[in-house]
Every structure is written in C-alpha cells, then in structure tokens.
Amino acid sequence: MSKTVRTLALGGLVLAGLSACVSVPRGQGSGAAVVDHVSDSARQAEAARQAWLQAHPHWSFQGRVAISKDRNGGSGRIDWQQDGPRYRVQLSAPVTRQSWVLTGDTTSGAGRLEGLEGGPRSGPDAEQVLLEATGWTIPVNQMPDWVRALRIAGAGAARVDLDAAGRPRTVQQDGWTIDFLAWTPASAEQPELPQRIEARSGEAKVRLLVDQWTVSP
C-alpha cells in the first residue's frame, strides 16, 4: 500500500470514529461585540488576566471538539493536559469507543500520535504528523495559547479585535482566524477563560466547546 493510500485510510478511520459522536453544540450565550474603544480599566484587567495565566503553566480542560476540512469532518470528546511546554491531548469517540492520543512539546514542536491502525507515528513536527495521519490541519503548537486567549497580541498576530472587557474577540494569526464566542466566568480559583472558540483557515475549521477548566496552583 502506498504512503498516500495509507494516509487516506488512517484519516478515514479517525474521521469515521469521531463522526459517530454528536456535533459540538453552540455554547450558551454569545460572544461580546467588537468595539472601537476599550477603557483603561478593561485593558488593565485583561493584562492582569494574561499575567496570571502566564504564571500558571500547568492546566487542563475537558470538552467537545469538531474538526472539518473540505467535506470531511467529525466530532468527539477532547481532554487536553498541559504541563509547561509539554501537552497530552486525547480525542475520543464514545459511541465507537475509539481514542487517539497526541503528545508533544511546543518548544521543540515534535509530537507523537497513538491509537492509529498500524501503530504510533512520531516526528519533529507534531502538526505534520497529525496532517499526514489524519488529513487534519490543526495548529497544535499555537493551541495552548489560543485556547486561553493568551499572549496573542504579542505573538505576531496580524489583527486582534477586542470586546468591551478588553478580551480578544477575533484574532488573525498565522493564516488562521480565531473567534472567541463565549467565556467562562471568573472564580476565586481562576480568571475568565474561553468557553467556545472557532478557528478556521481556508477549508479547515476547528470548533471547541470547553466543559471544564482546571488550572493548577
């Protein structure tokens, strides 16, 4: 079997498994509108939020994700665990009981994908490993910052639109457009964090709905 055929077959198996799950529902509430002016107090609050998150690099979230490209796509559960630059992401399809685990390091960019027919795949570029195995285009090395709406303005973003609270509303970066559509409220343990995110680049689209955030002290 050629490498191209193997890649398409692996991608088809993963998409078939995830497609058995229900699609990601729309989160409650809508994203705040983009504004032309943000108050100084709102900017200070957002700066404090980002500083707090930068000081807490160990975190996790559980939720639902939908991934599509061209006419192919699927949805399932996602469990993301971040330990500084290292991450472990588990995608699972409860109906088919299939799961895939991607581990990597945002410093080196390398990654390893397990759960595929034929055994694990690894390489120096986690995004390329994922693309070759599944056909998905997902910016996994940027995701730890994107999912928390963290350090976006200082990371070479082409455009950042803010809402009245000073939080990112829409970001254009590295060929992707990221919309922050809903936020979890702040608590005594942690500040506001994104609840519903949509990211798109050409025909590729990722939708994420976070059910629970956990940030370690």
UniProtKB/Swiss-Prot annotation:
GO terms for biological process: lipoprotein localization to outer membrane; protein transport. Its main location: membrane. Keywords: Cell outer membrane, Chaperone, Lipoprotein, Membrane, Palmitate, Protein transport, Signal, Transport. This is Outer-membrane lipoprotein LolB. It comes from Xanthomonas axonopodis pv. citri (strain 306). A lipid is attached at residue 21 (N-palmitoyl cysteine). InterPro entries: LolA/LolB/LppX, OM_lipoprot_LolB. A lipid is attached at residue 21 (S-diacylglycerol cysteine). Belongs to the LolB family. Pfam families: LolB (PF03550). NCBIfam families: lolB. It is a lipid-anchor. Plays a critical role in the incorporation of lipoproteins in the outer membrane after they are released by the LolA protein. It comes from the Bacteria. Residues 1-20 form the signal peptide. Monomer. Residues 105-124 are annotated as: Disordered. Disulfide bonds: none annotated. It is found in: Cell outer membrane. One of its GO terms (cellular component) is cell outer membrane.
